[in-house]
């Protein structure tokens, strides 16, 4: 297994859907989309359907009964007007999400999911389900794994690279090899911060952005909680993620 990391969707090579592309793609958005997705599916959501475009989200959501859907939307770290939930993993509790489909669009994470949507195997990872995703990949043994960060509006993010390094650390222990320099750098970042990932999330520029927006202590704790979940969000059809146990 060869593992590569690309900081944002815009850095993903155009060969993604060709013979030199990945057998599996893993999307990362630690603050906060892939953390929220993992917790929503863990807490019983029927599925999370992701959209880069808000008009497409609303059109698809309107085809579902009100009692079976939730609109989850965020731009700039804030909940969108008219949506049921923002992008906080603390909001997707069982009483709210169980049995429902979440129609989700965020500033960054849903763009990366859209970029890799045609890959045969698409997963999402965050720190809470790091080991579950690692075990899924170790069991399946795809030849090429591309991790794709979400960044912030097309630019590098510290926290996504941290999670990429965390996942790669588990994969390398099982015999995987590093395929690009971005992956090597992410591993070095994880080595530096693995004993206190929450501190890394807080000093990251997006962490600082959330701090300026208000009290997000609970979000930071949840996003930094390592290996707490066994759920592996897996694309069942383009844009639709469902829970699979790791």
From Swiss-Prot:
GO terms for molecular function: 2-phosphosulfolactate phosphatase activity; magnesium ion binding; sulfopyruvate decarboxylase activity. The keyword Hydrolase applies. Its EC number is 3.1.3.71. Disulfide bonds: none annotated. It catalyses: (2R)-O-phospho-3-sulfolactate + H2O = (2R)-3-sulfolactate + phosphate. The keyword Metal-binding does not apply. Keywords: Hydrolase, Magnesium. Its cofactor is Mg(2+). It is an enzyme of class 3 (hydrolase). Pfam families: 2-ph_phosp. HAMAP family: ComB (MF_00490). Belongs to the ComB family. PANTHER family: 2-PHOSPHOSULFOLACTATE PHOSPHATASE-RELATED (PTHR37311:SF1). This is Probable 2-phosphosulfolactate phosphatase. It comes from Synechococcus sp. (strain CC9311). The lineage of its organism: Bacteria, Bacillati, Cyanobacteriota, Cyanophyceae, Synechococcales. The gene is comB.
């Amino acid at each position: 297994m060869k593992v590569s990391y690309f900081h944002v969707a815009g850095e993903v090579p155009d060969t993604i859907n060709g013979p030199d592309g990945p057998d599996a793609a893993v999307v990362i958005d630690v603050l906060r989309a892939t953390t929220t997705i993992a917790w929503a599916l863990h807490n019983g959501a029927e599925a999370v359907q992701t959209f880069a475009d808000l008009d497409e989200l609303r059109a698809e959501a309107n085809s579902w009964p009100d009692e079976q859907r939730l609109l989850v939307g965020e731009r700039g770290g804030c909940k969108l007007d008219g949506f049921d939930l923002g992008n906080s993993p603390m909001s997707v509790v069982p009483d709210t999400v169980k049995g429902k489909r979440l129609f989700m669009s965020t500033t960054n994470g849903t763009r990366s999911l859209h970029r890799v949507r045609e890959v045969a195997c698409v997963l999402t990872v965050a720190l809470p389900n790091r080991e579950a995703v690692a075990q899924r990949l170790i069991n399946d043994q795809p030849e090429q794994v591309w991790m794709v960060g979400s960044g912030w509006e097309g630019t590098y993010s510290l926290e996504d690279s941290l999670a990429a390094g965390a996942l790669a650390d588990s994969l390398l222990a099982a015999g995987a090899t590093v395929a690009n320099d971005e992956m090597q750098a992410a591993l070095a970042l994880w080595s530096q911060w693995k004993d206190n990932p929450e501190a890394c999330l807080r000093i990251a520029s997006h962490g600082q952005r959330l701090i300026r927006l208000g009290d997000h202590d609970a979000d930071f704790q949840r996003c930094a909680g390592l290996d707490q979940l066994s759920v592996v969000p897996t694309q069942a059809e383009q844009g639709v993620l469902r829970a699979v146990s790791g």
